[in-house]
């Protein structure tokens, strides 16, 4: 099994184990209190800062984003304003990924401006913190990144991993996320993506929006040993 597949399986198993611990509504959908997540988000980097001291900075709480639905229509889950240091998170997006998005946006507050690095750092912070809700959200966000990469090269292996590891709870969150974004696909989202792509290029991020996918290389490198010993 390739390292990519090993790390994907590792993330799937971690997410599956935590999926049954999350608060859910009567239909099984993720129902953790997001207000509490925003309050607890200020401590999410404490563990990762021990391994990466360069990230040790005072935390500023993220805020729920006004007009979140509009941001979803443009394909955005969060916005960081570098001039004020304020990070805003889309709360109309699937709730199961909001905690990991909080961690992602807080990485920008720590001078991680590249989207490639911010995606990785946010996931690493979330899964290493002591909060099960942030951990689950981080494993899930990383799993989505890894599965997209694995499916592109080996769909059969991806299906084998999903069949072997996904719990009903994890499957529900996975489908909720896919259905939400599928329903919002439109020319508006495509135009916004092109505009953001141009913005990233102008700020020296040569991989542009594709840099989100390049996060997989960092995940495989960082978690490869753990996955190999799993």
Segments predicted by a language model, with ranges:
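Pan-zinc metallopeptidase signature
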Residues: 165-230
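Short helix/loop segments within enzyme catalytic domains
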Residues: 123-158
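Hydrophobic or amphipathic, alpha-helical segments that drive membrane association/targeting
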Residues: 1-19
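Solvent-exposed, acidic/flexible segments
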Residues: 91-99, 111-115, 133-136, 188
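Membrane-proximal, solvent-exposed terminal domains/tails of membrane-associated proteins
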Residues: 114-120, 132-139, 166-175, 179
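Auxiliary, metal-adjacent structural segments of Zn-dependent hydrolase domains
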Residues: 18-85, 91, 95
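Helix-rich C-terminal "cap"/substrate-channel and partner-interaction subdomain
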Residues: 143-144, 152, 158-175
